[in-house]
A protein has these predicted regions:
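Extracellular/luminal segments of secreted precursors and ectodomains of membrane proteins
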Residues: 3-187
Length: 187
């Protein structure tokens, strides 16, 4: 069976409002954390499907659609909200194996709510970014188009591209900073 294409009947604004309602003053840090989780997952799924090695745009589109579905459906379960980082902000985290057996029934239910929130955010972000991601990946394959402008993913840094530049859910200081001043080493 072919999986259904990722389509959303809700928007990023809807998800932001949902996070604000559920998580109040922690909504911003959890939106950023959820975006980083989605970016990490899409990077893994695109890599697993050899997206950069696809021969033509239709093949790349098909692989990207599969990767988006699997990136979101494959989010960790359970997924918990933990305090940590800067100023005690909250973030999503997969519990360690040793912590799994100590989760209470209430904590397990909370973890399912957290996973549903992260899943919805993932679907909205990646469905919205799908065509822009394709453009970036195709441009990356064309030697004369490898000059990167603001908003493009360098070296497959989907975290910075998706979370800080495109969706603007994270500050630049909150995402991986491996694409700065790295243009000299490109082929």
């Amino acid at each position: 069976q072919a999986k259904e294409e990722v389509a959303s009947d809700f928007t990023l604004s809807d998800v932001k409002k949902e996070f604000l309602d559920k998580y109040a003053e922690n909504a911003r840090s959890l939106l950023c954390s959820g975006c980083i989780l989605a970016a990490d997952r899409i990077g893994d799924e695109l890599g697993a499907r050899n997206a950069s090695g696809q021969p033509d745009p239709p093949a790349l589109l098909a692989v990207t659609k599969e990767a988006i579905i699997e990136a979101c459906d494959g989010l960790p379960s359970p997924l918990i909200v933990v305090e940590g980082g800067k100023k005690g902000s909250l973030h999503f985290e997969e519990p360690h194996d040793s912590a799994l057996e100590h989760l209470t029934g209430v904590e397990l239910r909370r973890s399912e709510v957290a996973r549903r929130s992260a899943h919805r955010l993932c679907r909205v972000l990646l469905a919205d970014a799908k065509l822009a991601m394709l453009e970036v990946m195709m441009r990356h394959k064309v030697p004369h188009a490898r000059r990167h402008s603001s908003g493009e993913a360098l070296h497959d840094n989907w975290e910075r591209w998706l979370c800080a530049r495109r969706a603007r859910l994270c500050k630049r200081s909150e995402v991986v900073d491996d694409d700065e001043d790295d243009h000299e080493g490109e082929l």
